[in-house]
Amino acid sequence: MLYGHRRDTEGYAKALEHFDSRLPEIEAAMRADDVMMITADHGNDPTFRGSDHTREYAPLLVYGKSARGGVNLGTRDSLADIGQTIAENFGLKLTAGKGFLKDLL
């Protein structure tokens, strides 16, 4: 998605709406043991005037029949924690990051 980097707030909003409109399809196709994790490689404020990344946090939304609701993970030390958590879900272990899958499921 290039809208945030291009500071195109209208395009950014429309792209998010389009993505959101497809979520019911994904949810309908999910099996009982599937977990959907939606995240980003960094946070970004598309209204910021500069061209660099801003200091917003990277989002993480988790959905699945086994997912616990209302979990506050606090501020993590590294974005690698998300990668480690996804790897844990598949029974893998990465060399960086502290997984938190046990807090989500």
Question: Language-model segments: which ranges?
Answer:
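Feature captures the catalytic ectodomains and active-site-proximal regions of enzymes
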Residues: 1-105
